[in-house]
Amino acid sequence: MDIIETAKLEGHLESQTNDSTNTYTSPTEAVEEEGKNGKGKPKTLSNGLRKGAKKYPDYIQISMPNDSKNKFPLEWWKTGIAFVYALFNLILTTVMITVVHERVPPKELSPPLPDKFFDYFDRVKWAFSVSEINGMVLVGLWITQWLFLRYKSIVGRRFFFIMGTLYLYRCITMYVTTLPVPGMHFQCAPKLNGDSQAKIQRILRLISGGGLSITGSHILCGDFLFSGHTVVLTLTYLFIKEYSPRHFWWYHLVCWLLSAAGIICILVAHEHYTVDVIIAYYITTRLFWWYHSMANEKNLKVSSQTNFLSRAWWFPIFYFFEKNVQGSIPCCFSWPLSWPPGCFKSSCRKYSRVQKIGEDNEKST
């Protein structure tokens, strides 16, 4: 009787095992069946995965969804276009300064216009040098910060586009209205009276010296409406603050002090009228805020009857640069150059749990 009961028990267990085997589909069979049915491309598992699945059948294959579309594509070629746009307008500005310089009336015939700030504050000679030094420090800080940004290509083309557009506006304003020099201390270079070769030399001198007075390259007059120094001081601070962590308040404060002191020194040096500085600050901040509001809000990227910002002349250019950027850019940093390079990195050192089990099984057998 014991033998008969044991045989019945073994038969019962064998039938249960067969039933469970018939209802269970191994990962390898699932993949092959999927390929046969045409639901996907035929796939085969690696030896490690196959052996690991046989040894440990509780591991089942989970089909992972395809990688979602990158929300922040780098698109460096667009950044290159924005850089060319900014460079063109900067060169155009030097050409326009050279042209306008020939139209500036002599200070003996057209004295400086009345300015309330000049009435209350006397001129300080060294103040303009402080302004230019502050500007160079801010530019240096911004370039360094930009190099460590993870999405530097997107931020870079925003900076180049805004900077180029501001200098395009500056070309227009200084050409249509030529103001007399703000002070009798100005020593303007002599007029060339149609000497094209000498004008080209002046343009190259302005470009090589960055248009700065401390480099001795800015000896021309007429570029008063509006202040290019104020544009640089304001725009670099706005980008530094926007693309740095919010808890870096001390960093923001130092940059704000550099920017504010530089703008005040422009007026203290009597190098620009007060209206030049006010207009430069207003246009720079508004263009920066409008652009980033449109870039961060999906609804503002679409031209519609209710989106009045889409009626700006530069909206098609904005849409070209920002149409693939989904949402606000996170404040992330990364090394400018990865080390070690990708050619020295071995992907064979990375294993999944199942692959590791499969290799252990091979060694044991």
Swiss-Prot record:
UniProt keyword list: Cell membrane, Golgi apparatus, Kinase, Lipid metabolism, Lipoprotein, Membrane, Palmitate, Sphingolipid metabolism, Transferase, Transmembrane, Transmembrane helix
E.C. numbers: 2.7.8.27
Biased composition (Polar residues): 14-28
Record note on disruption phenotype: Null mice are viable but exhibit increased cell membrane ceramide and decreased sphingomyelin levels. In both skeletal muscle and adipose tissue, there is a significant increase in glucose uptake. This leads to increased insulin sensitivity and ameliorated high-fat diet-induced obesity. There is blunted NFKB1- and MAP kinase-mediated responses to inflammatory stimuli and macrophages display increased cholesterol efflux into blood circulation. Liver SMS activity is markedly reduced (by about 80%) but only small change in macrophage SMS2 activity (16%).
Regions of this protein lying in the Cytoplasmic compartment: 291-365
Transmembrane segments: 80-100, 128-148, 159-179, 219-239, 248-268, 273-290
UniProt xrefs under InterPro entries: Sphingomyelin_synth-like (IPR045221), Sphingomyelin_synth-like_dom (IPR025749)
Changes after translation: Palmitoylated on Cys-331, Cys-332, Cys-343 and Cys-348; which plays an important role in plasma membrane localization.
Lipidated residue numbers (S-palmitoyl cysteine): C331, C332, C343, C348
Catalytic activity: an N-acylsphing-4-enine + a 1,2-diacyl-sn-glycero-3-phosphocholine = a sphingomyelin + a 1,2-diacyl-sn-glycerol; an N-acylsphinganine + a 1,2-diacyl-sn-glycero-3-phosphocholine = an N-acylsphinganine-1-phosphocholine + a 1,2-diacyl-sn-glycerol; an N-acyl-(4R)-4-hydroxysphinganine + a 1,2-diacyl-sn-glycero-3-phosphocholine = an N-acyl-(4R)-4-hydroxysphinganine-phosphocholine + a 1,2-diacyl-sn-glycerol; an N-acylsphing-4-enine + a 1,2-diacyl-sn-glycero-3-phosphoethanolamine = an N-acylsphing-4-enine 1-phosphoethanolamine + a 1,2-diacyl-sn-glycerol
UniProt GO MF annotations: ceramide cholinephosphotransferase activity; ceramide phosphoethanolamine synthase activity; kinase activity; sphingomyelin synthase activity
Subcellular location: Cell membrane; Golgi apparatus membrane
Active site residues per record: H229, H272, D276
Record-level GO BP terms: ceramide biosynthetic process; ceramide phosphoethanolamine biosynthetic process; regulation of bone mineralization; sphingomyelin biosynthetic process
Recorded family membership: Belongs to the sphingomyelin synthase family.
Protein name (record): Phosphatidylcholine:ceramide cholinephosphotransferase 2
Organism: Mus musculus (Mouse)
